[in-house]
Amino acid sequence: MSDQPSTPEPSALEKTQALLASLWQRNLPTLRQRLDTLDQAVAVEPIAPELLNEAIIIAHKLSGSLGLFGHHHATEIARELEHLFRNPSSAAPGRTKFLTQELRTTLALPEAPPTA
């Protein structure tokens, strides 16, 4: 018998939360890169076709993955962005830019500093 107090085993929920937190941290660089690409896409109207296609793919990926990490509002924003990118004529002027900024704010990921 050991004199040391036993440490309780983490619950399944705690293990899952720890795993998700680890995955979130590991994927932050990719997420920031995707947000930067969305920023580039909405910076100039009209969006270049290649950048528009990339923005559609990114918005789709974000709408499918952010909810897993508990970012349900961000999922809705990404879903709306995807719709607007797929149907550019339905976008109110500045709406995609606003939503891209809102997505970044919701995820608490500030814009990357400008590179020289």
Where are these regions (language model features)?
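Short, low-complexity N-terminal regulatory "tails/caps" that precede and couple sensory modules
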Residues: 1-15
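Long, amphipathic alpha-helical coiled-coil segments characteristic
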Residues: 13-55, 97-111
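N-terminal assembly/transducer modules of large multi-domain enzymes
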Residues: 24, 28, 65-71, 76, ...
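Extended, amphipathic alpha-helices with heptad-repeat/coiled-coil or helix-bundle character
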Residues: 49-87
